């Protein structure tokens, strides 16, 4: 689809100090770049070097799916999303060549939003897997061995029920801090991506809270009846639940600020949402 030039900005925002914005980029790259390298190493170990060992444990299949998704999202941030936002010096060049970016944006933005949705689904599955380990220790291995491929396939297809509206819509460029941000101009009025994401995020929060609470209660009663290795994985999923809830809390606060039209605070909260998404992208690997 072509760039929507009517909705897109035609000039750069000069209200931000370029060097300050560059510093923001540098600070974010300081944790994003090592995280990308670390994620690539983990993916190599689990998917290739010791694949025979990890393939037997269905939990690590879910973990690998989360790592691969996070790795792609982190690289999107490093090589495109963040430089576009925090390098105001490139703003004029991008706007001058905006038409040449149409094909790239048609591929990048739907993929970016698809991966965000898929990651949330995988993280729901992540917590559900650990909860089932505690609740049904005798049968959970057989269940996940039988159904995991089908569940992951369903989860991989599910975001497409929403992504199509982004894929067919015009993309547009708007101001983001001193730089630019990619959005889309909705072509089908009733197909609202914000509604889909709200439902997905709400489902995620409810599932994570219920599963984690149930798991903690059950673990406190099981004592030594659960293997120490499984117990550690369960505690790891508790820590991950906190990481997964952070973006939900930040997004809710951001929504309230926009609804109240307190736009002077929206920039800070938008930055907080971005950081919380970074935490979600990389936390599972560091915790594990």
Swiss-Prot record:
Organism: Caenorhabditis elegans
PANTHER family: SERPENTINE RECEPTOR CLASS GAMMA-1-RELATED, SERPENTINE RECEPTOR CLASS GAMMA-RELATED
GO CC terms, sorted: membrane
Pfam family, any one: Srg
Predominant cellular place of this UniProt entry's protein: membrane
Keyword Transmembrane: yes
Subcellular location, record wording: Membrane
Keyword tags: Membrane, Transmembrane, Transmembrane helix
Coiled coil: none
Any GO molecular function: transmembrane signaling receptor activity
Record-level GO BP terms: sensory perception of chemical stimulus
Topology in the lipid bilayer: Multi-pass membrane protein
Similarity remark: Belongs to the nematode receptor-like protein srg family.
Record protein name field: Serpentine receptor class gamma-1
Transmembrane residue ranges: 25-45, 59-79, 118-138, 148-168, 197-217, 238-258, 268-288
Domain of life of the organism encoding this protein: Eukaryota
InterPro entries in UniProt: 7TM_GPCR_serpentine_rcpt_Srg, Nematode_SR-like
